[in-house]
Amino acid sequence: MKRALVTGGAGLIGSHVADLLVREGWEVRVLDNLEPQTHRRGRPSWINDRAEFIEGDLRDRETISAALDKIDIVFHQAAYGGYMPEIAKYVHVNSLGTAQMLEVICEKNLPVRKIVVASSQAVYSEGAGDCPEHGMVFPSVRPVEQLRKGDWEVHCPLCSAITRSVPTPENAPVGGETVYGLTKVDQEKLVLLWGKQTGIPTVALRYSCTYGPRQSIFNPYTGVIAIFCTRLLNNLAPVLYEDGEQTRDFSFVEDIARANLLAAETDKLDGSPVNVGSGTGTPIRQIAEQLSAALKIDIAPEINGEFRPGEMRHLTSDTTRIRAIGYKPDVDLAEGIARYIDWIRSQSDIRDYFSEAAEILRNKGIVHKVQKTGR
Protein backbone atom coordinates (compact mmCIF):
# COMPACT_ATOMS: atom_id res chain seq x y z
CA MET A 1 0.00 0.00 0.00
CA LYS A 2 1.31 3.46 -0.93
CA ARG A 3 1.75 5.83 2.01
CA ALA A 4 1.18 9.54 1.42
CA LEU A 5 1.63 12.69 3.46
CA VAL A 6 -0.63 15.57 2.47
CA THR A 7 0.61 18.82 4.00
CA GLY A 8 -2.12 21.43 4.27
CA GLY A 9 -4.49 18.48 4.15
CA ALA A 10 -7.38 20.22 5.90
CA GLY A 11 -7.54 22.96 3.28
CA LEU A 12 -9.45 23.26 0.04
CA ILE A 13 -7.07 21.35 -2.22
CA GLY A 14 -5.31 19.21 0.36
CA SER A 15 -8.52 17.74 1.78
CA HIS A 16 -9.73 16.74 -1.69
CA VAL A 17 -6.34 15.20 -2.49
CA ALA A 18 -6.57 13.21 0.76
CA ASP A 19 -10.10 12.04 -0.06
CA LEU A 20 -9.07 10.90 -3.54
CA LEU A 21 -6.04 9.02 -2.24
CA VAL A 22 -8.14 7.23 0.40
CA ARG A 23 -10.63 6.19 -2.28
CA GLU A 24 -7.75 4.88 -4.37
CA GLY A 25 -6.57 2.69 -1.51
CA TRP A 26 -3.64 4.74 -0.25
CA GLU A 27 -2.65 5.02 3.39
CA VAL A 28 -2.92 8.75 4.06
CA ARG A 29 -1.54 11.06 6.72
CA VAL A 30 -2.66 14.68 6.89
CA LEU A 31 -0.61 17.50 8.42
CA ASP A 32 -2.27 20.87 8.96
CA ASN A 33 -1.80 23.69 11.47
CA LEU A 34 -5.45 24.79 11.13
CA GLU A 35 -4.44 28.39 10.40
CA PRO A 36 -7.13 30.54 12.09
CA GLN A 37 -7.48 32.84 9.07
CA THR A 38 -8.76 29.84 7.11
CA HIS A 39 -10.10 27.52 9.82
CA ARG A 40 -11.75 30.00 12.16
CA ARG A 41 -13.92 27.29 13.74
CA GLY A 42 -11.10 24.86 14.33
CA ARG A 43 -10.80 21.39 12.88
CA PRO A 44 -13.23 21.04 9.95
CA SER A 45 -15.65 18.12 9.80
CA TRP A 46 -14.54 17.15 6.30
CA ILE A 47 -11.13 15.77 7.30
CA ASN A 48 -11.29 12.16 6.15
CA ASP A 49 -11.75 9.83 9.12
CA ARG A 50 -9.79 7.13 7.28
CA ALA A 51 -6.71 9.36 7.20
CA GLU A 52 -4.36 9.91 10.13
CA PHE A 53 -4.49 13.56 11.18
CA ILE A 54 -1.65 15.51 12.77
CA GLU A 55 -2.36 19.04 13.90
CA GLY A 56 0.93 20.85 13.67
CA ASP A 57 3.11 23.27 11.77
CA LEU A 58 5.63 22.18 9.16
CA ARG A 59 7.93 24.91 10.47
CA ASP A 60 8.36 22.81 13.62
CA ARG A 61 11.19 20.35 12.95
CA GLU A 62 9.90 17.63 15.26
CA THR A 63 6.40 17.87 13.79
CA ILE A 64 7.49 17.54 10.17
CA SER A 65 9.87 14.72 11.12
CA ALA A 66 7.00 12.77 12.69
CA ALA A 67 4.69 13.52 9.77
CA LEU A 68 7.24 12.19 7.25
CA ASP A 69 7.88 8.93 9.08
CA LYS A 70 7.43 5.90 6.76
CA ILE A 71 6.01 8.09 3.96
CA ASP A 72 6.50 7.18 0.28
CA ILE A 73 5.05 10.21 -1.50
CA VAL A 74 4.54 13.78 -0.28
CA PHE A 75 1.78 16.00 -1.65
CA HIS A 76 3.03 19.36 -0.39
CA GLN A 77 -0.04 21.61 -0.40
CA ALA A 78 0.66 23.67 2.73
CA ALA A 79 1.13 27.37 2.03
CA TYR A 80 0.20 30.82 3.27
CA GLY A 81 -1.75 32.44 0.46
CA GLY A 82 -3.50 35.49 -0.90
CA TYR A 83 -2.75 39.19 -0.48
CA MET A 84 -2.24 39.33 3.27
CA PRO A 85 0.28 41.93 4.48
CA GLU A 86 2.47 39.59 6.59
CA ILE A 87 5.63 39.37 4.48
CA ALA A 88 7.72 37.45 7.00
CA LYS A 89 5.02 34.82 7.48
CA TYR A 90 4.86 34.11 3.74
CA VAL A 91 8.61 33.51 3.71
CA HIS A 92 8.64 31.46 6.92
CA VAL A 93 5.79 29.17 5.86
CA ASN A 94 6.19 28.87 2.11
CA SER A 95 9.93 29.20 1.55
CA LEU A 96 11.59 28.17 4.82
CA GLY A 97 8.94 25.60 5.71
CA THR A 98 9.54 23.85 2.39
CA ALA A 99 13.32 24.06 2.81
CA GLN A 100 13.10 22.52 6.27
CA MET A 101 10.94 19.64 5.02
CA LEU A 102 13.54 18.84 2.36
CA GLU A 103 16.35 19.04 4.92
CA VAL A 104 14.59 16.62 7.26
CA ILE A 105 14.08 14.04 4.50
CA CYS A 106 17.82 14.05 3.75
CA GLU A 107 18.99 14.37 7.34
CA LYS A 108 17.00 11.33 8.47
CA ASN A 109 17.47 9.43 5.20
CA LEU A 110 13.70 8.96 4.93
CA PRO A 111 12.31 6.65 2.23
CA VAL A 112 10.39 9.37 0.36
CA ARG A 113 10.15 8.34 -3.30
CA LYS A 114 8.48 11.43 -4.79
CA ILE A 115 7.28 14.94 -3.97
CA VAL A 116 4.42 16.70 -5.74
CA VAL A 117 4.50 20.37 -4.73
CA ALA A 118 1.67 22.85 -5.16
CA SER A 119 2.86 25.84 -7.14
CA SER A 120 0.66 28.55 -8.63
CA GLN A 121 -0.04 30.70 -11.66
CA ALA A 122 1.09 33.53 -9.36
CA VAL A 123 4.69 32.68 -10.32
CA TYR A 124 4.13 34.43 -13.65
CA SER A 125 4.57 38.19 -13.81
CA GLU A 126 1.91 38.62 -16.48
CA GLY A 127 0.13 36.25 -18.80
CA ALA A 128 1.43 35.71 -22.32
CA GLY A 129 0.18 38.08 -25.00
CA ASP A 130 -0.15 38.13 -28.76
CA CYS A 131 1.26 41.28 -30.37
CA PRO A 132 0.02 42.20 -33.87
CA GLU A 133 3.64 42.72 -34.97
CA HIS A 134 5.77 40.44 -32.79
CA GLY A 135 3.53 37.44 -32.13
CA MET A 136 3.71 35.79 -28.70
CA VAL A 137 5.41 37.98 -26.13
CA PHE A 138 5.86 37.80 -22.38
CA PRO A 139 5.09 41.27 -20.97
CA SER A 140 6.37 42.43 -17.63
CA VAL A 141 4.06 43.47 -14.84
CA ARG A 142 2.25 46.72 -15.60
CA PRO A 143 3.92 49.76 -13.99
CA VAL A 144 2.11 51.39 -11.09
CA GLU A 145 2.30 54.72 -12.91
CA GLN A 146 0.29 53.23 -15.78
CA LEU A 147 -2.32 51.76 -13.45
CA ARG A 148 -2.73 55.04 -11.58
CA LYS A 149 -3.93 56.54 -14.87
CA GLY A 150 -6.57 53.83 -15.23
CA ASP A 151 -4.76 52.25 -18.16
CA TRP A 152 -5.36 48.55 -17.55
CA GLU A 153 -4.15 47.16 -20.87
CA VAL A 154 -1.07 45.00 -21.33
CA HIS A 155 1.43 46.38 -23.84
CA CYS A 156 4.00 44.61 -25.97
CA PRO A 157 7.47 44.98 -24.40
CA LEU A 158 8.95 45.48 -27.88
CA CYS A 159 6.63 48.01 -29.54
CA SER A 160 4.08 49.01 -26.85
CA ALA A 161 1.11 47.80 -28.89
CA ILE A 162 -1.82 46.44 -26.90
CA THR A 163 -1.58 42.66 -26.73
CA ARG A 164 -4.30 40.01 -26.84
CA SER A 165 -4.25 37.47 -24.03
CA VAL A 166 -3.21 33.94 -25.04
CA PRO A 167 -2.56 30.82 -22.92
CA THR A 168 0.68 31.01 -20.96
CA PRO A 169 3.12 28.08 -21.37
CA GLU A 170 5.46 26.79 -18.68
CA ASN A 171 8.50 28.35 -20.37
CA ALA A 172 7.18 31.86 -19.73
CA PRO A 173 9.42 33.91 -17.41
CA VAL A 174 8.71 33.56 -13.70
CA GLY A 175 9.54 35.91 -10.89
CA GLY A 176 6.44 36.54 -8.85
CA GLU A 177 5.24 40.13 -8.50
CA THR A 178 3.51 39.59 -5.16
CA VAL A 179 5.02 38.28 -1.94
CA TYR A 180 2.89 35.15 -2.29
CA GLY A 181 3.99 34.67 -5.91
CA LEU A 182 7.64 35.15 -5.00
CA THR A 183 7.45 32.49 -2.29
CA LYS A 184 5.68 30.07 -4.65
CA VAL A 185 8.64 30.52 -7.01
CA ASP A 186 10.84 29.64 -4.03
CA GLN A 187 8.79 26.54 -3.26
CA GLU A 188 8.85 25.09 -6.73
CA LYS A 189 12.50 25.92 -7.40
CA LEU A 190 13.61 24.48 -4.05
CA VAL A 191 11.73 21.24 -4.60
CA LEU A 192 12.80 20.80 -8.23
CA LEU A 193 16.45 21.65 -7.48
CA TRP A 194 16.46 19.29 -4.49
CA GLY A 195 15.02 16.56 -6.69
CA LYS A 196 17.82 16.95 -9.23
CA GLN A 197 20.45 16.89 -6.49
CA THR A 198 19.07 13.84 -4.68
CA GLY A 199 17.71 11.90 -7.63
CA ILE A 200 14.27 11.76 -6.00
CA PRO A 201 11.51 12.55 -8.54
CA THR A 202 9.73 15.86 -8.01
CA VAL A 203 7.09 17.80 -9.91
CA ALA A 204 5.60 21.27 -9.37
CA LEU A 205 1.96 21.81 -10.33
CA ARG A 206 1.17 25.42 -11.22
CA TYR A 207 -2.50 25.63 -10.28
CA SER A 208 -4.89 28.07 -11.87
CA CYS A 209 -7.52 29.73 -9.62
CA THR A 210 -8.95 26.80 -7.69
CA TYR A 211 -12.44 26.84 -6.20
CA GLY A 212 -15.08 24.49 -4.89
CA PRO A 213 -16.63 23.11 -1.69
CA ARG A 214 -14.51 23.68 1.45
CA GLN A 215 -13.02 26.93 0.18
CA SER A 216 -12.74 29.05 3.29
CA ILE A 217 -15.63 31.40 3.93
CA PHE A 218 -13.52 33.20 6.54
CA ASN A 219 -10.46 34.24 4.54
CA PRO A 220 -11.12 37.54 2.71
CA TYR A 221 -7.67 37.66 1.15
CA THR A 222 -7.90 34.75 -1.28
CA GLY A 223 -10.50 32.92 -3.39
CA VAL A 224 -12.52 35.36 -5.47
CA ILE A 225 -15.53 33.04 -5.85
CA ALA A 226 -15.78 32.54 -2.10
CA ILE A 227 -15.32 36.26 -1.44
CA PHE A 228 -17.99 37.26 -3.96
CA CYS A 229 -20.43 34.67 -2.58
CA THR A 230 -20.04 35.81 1.01
CA ARG A 231 -20.58 39.41 -0.10
CA LEU A 232 -23.73 38.55 -2.05
CA LEU A 233 -25.14 36.39 0.74
CA ASN A 234 -24.80 39.44 2.99
CA ASN A 235 -26.58 41.62 0.41
CA LEU A 236 -23.37 43.42 -0.47
CA ALA A 237 -21.93 44.05 -3.91
CA PRO A 238 -18.89 42.09 -5.08
CA VAL A 239 -16.00 44.56 -5.40
CA LEU A 240 -14.06 44.40 -8.66
CA TYR A 241 -10.55 45.78 -8.97
CA GLU A 242 -9.54 47.67 -12.13
CA ASP A 243 -12.48 47.50 -14.58
CA GLY A 244 -13.48 43.90 -13.90
CA GLU A 245 -12.41 42.75 -17.36
CA GLN A 246 -9.23 41.04 -16.16
CA THR A 247 -9.37 37.30 -16.83
CA ARG A 248 -8.43 34.21 -14.87
CA ASP A 249 -8.39 30.48 -15.50
CA PHE A 250 -10.66 28.70 -12.99
CA SER A 251 -10.35 25.04 -11.98
CA PHE A 252 -12.72 22.98 -9.87
CA VAL A 253 -10.96 21.48 -6.87
CA GLU A 254 -11.75 17.86 -7.70
CA ASP A 255 -9.98 18.29 -11.05
CA ILE A 256 -6.94 19.70 -9.27
CA ALA A 257 -6.92 16.69 -6.92
CA ARG A 258 -6.94 14.34 -9.91
CA ALA A 259 -3.99 16.21 -11.40
CA ASN A 260 -2.05 15.53 -8.20
CA LEU A 261 -2.74 11.81 -8.39
CA LEU A 262 -1.78 11.76 -12.06
CA ALA A 263 1.48 13.59 -11.34
CA ALA A 264 2.30 11.12 -8.57
CA GLU A 265 1.70 8.07 -10.73
CA THR A 266 3.53 9.10 -13.92
CA ASP A 267 7.18 9.89 -14.52
CA LYS A 268 6.45 11.96 -17.62
CA LEU A 269 6.18 15.23 -15.69
CA ASP A 270 9.09 14.67 -13.31
CA GLY A 271 11.67 17.37 -12.79
CA SER A 272 9.61 20.25 -14.13
CA PRO A 273 6.80 22.72 -13.47
CA VAL A 274 3.46 21.88 -15.09
CA ASN A 275 0.43 24.11 -15.63
CA VAL A 276 -2.88 22.75 -14.36
CA GLY A 277 -6.02 24.59 -15.42
CA SER A 278 -9.01 24.66 -17.70
CA GLY A 279 -7.23 26.46 -20.52
CA THR A 280 -10.04 29.03 -20.66
CA GLY A 281 -9.93 32.61 -19.40
CA THR A 282 -13.02 34.12 -17.76
CA PRO A 283 -13.47 37.83 -16.94
CA ILE A 284 -13.84 38.53 -13.23
CA ARG A 285 -16.92 40.64 -13.95
CA GLN A 286 -18.53 37.58 -15.54
CA ILE A 287 -17.78 35.54 -12.42
CA ALA A 288 -19.58 38.12 -10.27
CA GLU A 289 -22.57 38.13 -12.63
CA GLN A 290 -22.75 34.32 -12.79
CA LEU A 291 -22.69 34.07 -9.01
CA SER A 292 -25.37 36.73 -8.66
CA ALA A 293 -27.61 34.86 -11.12
CA ALA A 294 -26.97 31.46 -9.56
CA LEU A 295 -27.68 32.76 -6.06
CA LYS A 296 -30.73 34.67 -7.35
CA ILE A 297 -29.44 37.81 -5.63
CA ASP A 298 -29.69 40.76 -7.99
CA ILE A 299 -26.80 42.97 -6.90
CA ALA A 300 -24.51 44.50 -9.51
CA PRO A 301 -20.76 44.40 -8.88
CA GLU A 302 -19.05 47.55 -7.64
CA ILE A 303 -16.10 49.15 -9.41
CA ASN A 304 -14.43 51.92 -7.44
CA GLY A 305 -11.20 52.60 -9.32
CA GLU A 306 -8.95 50.52 -7.08
CA PHE A 307 -6.16 48.19 -8.12
CA ARG A 308 -3.42 46.03 -6.62
CA PRO A 309 0.13 46.70 -7.91
CA GLY A 310 1.82 43.56 -9.17
CA GLU A 311 -1.44 41.84 -10.06
CA MET A 312 -1.50 40.35 -13.55
CA ARG A 313 -4.16 41.49 -16.00
CA HIS A 314 -4.78 38.19 -17.74
CA LEU A 315 -3.70 34.63 -17.06
CA THR A 316 -4.92 31.54 -18.86
CA SER A 317 -2.91 28.35 -18.49
CA ASP A 318 -1.53 26.53 -21.51
CA THR A 319 -2.30 22.97 -20.42
CA THR A 320 -0.84 21.17 -23.44
CA ARG A 321 1.73 19.24 -21.39
CA ILE A 322 -0.59 17.78 -18.78
CA ARG A 323 -3.34 17.07 -21.31
CA ALA A 324 -0.81 15.08 -23.35
CA ILE A 325 -0.66 12.48 -20.58
CA GLY A 326 -4.41 12.18 -20.20
CA TYR A 327 -5.52 15.04 -17.95
CA LYS A 328 -8.87 16.58 -18.83
CA PRO A 329 -10.99 18.73 -16.50
CA ASP A 330 -14.31 17.04 -15.73
CA VAL A 331 -16.17 19.97 -14.17
CA ASP A 332 -16.88 23.12 -16.18
CA LEU A 333 -17.37 26.54 -14.62
CA ALA A 334 -21.19 26.49 -14.62
CA GLU A 335 -21.36 23.11 -12.90
CA GLY A 336 -18.57 24.03 -10.50
CA ILE A 337 -20.28 27.25 -9.44
CA ALA A 338 -23.57 25.39 -8.91
CA ARG A 339 -21.84 22.81 -6.73
CA TYR A 340 -20.02 25.49 -4.74
CA ILE A 341 -23.24 27.39 -4.14
CA ASP A 342 -24.97 24.22 -2.93
CA TRP A 343 -22.13 23.80 -0.45
CA ILE A 344 -21.89 27.39 0.78
CA ARG A 345 -25.66 27.54 1.36
CA SER A 346 -25.21 24.61 3.74
CA GLN A 347 -22.78 26.62 5.88
CA SER A 348 -23.89 28.59 8.92
CA ASP A 349 -23.23 32.17 9.96
CA ILE A 350 -21.78 33.43 6.67
CA ARG A 351 -20.33 36.88 7.25
CA ASP A 352 -18.60 39.53 5.18
CA TYR A 353 -14.94 39.73 6.13
CA PHE A 354 -13.90 41.52 2.95
CA SER A 355 -14.81 45.09 3.96
CA GLU A 356 -12.44 45.13 6.93
CA ALA A 357 -9.70 43.32 5.00
CA ALA A 358 -9.92 45.75 2.09
CA GLU A 359 -9.42 48.68 4.45
CA ILE A 360 -6.36 46.98 5.96
CA LEU A 361 -4.90 46.49 2.48
CA ARG A 362 -5.51 50.14 1.64
CA ASN A 363 -3.77 51.26 4.82
CA LYS A 364 -0.84 48.93 4.13
CA GLY A 365 -0.42 50.31 0.61
CA ILE A 366 -1.34 47.01 -1.06
CA VAL A 367 -4.46 48.45 -2.68
CA HIS A 368 -4.17 51.73 -4.63
CA LYS A 369 -6.66 54.03 -6.30
CA VAL A 370 -6.69 55.63 -9.73
CA GLN A 371 -5.53 59.24 -9.57
CA LYS A 372 -8.04 61.60 -11.12
CA THR A 373 -6.58 64.29 -13.32
CA GLY A 374 -7.99 67.74 -13.88
CA ARG A 375 -8.84 69.25 -17.21
Segment roles from a protein language model:
Residues 23-26, 333-375:
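Amphipathic terminal alpha-helices
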Residues 243, 273-274, 282-289, 296-314, ...:
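C-terminal "lid/loop" region of Rossmann-like NAD(P)-dependent oxidoreductases
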Residues 17, 260-264, 291, 319, ...:
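Hydrophobic "lid"/C-terminal helical patch
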Residues 251-255, 332:
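A conserved structural motif in NAD(P)-dependent oxidoreductases
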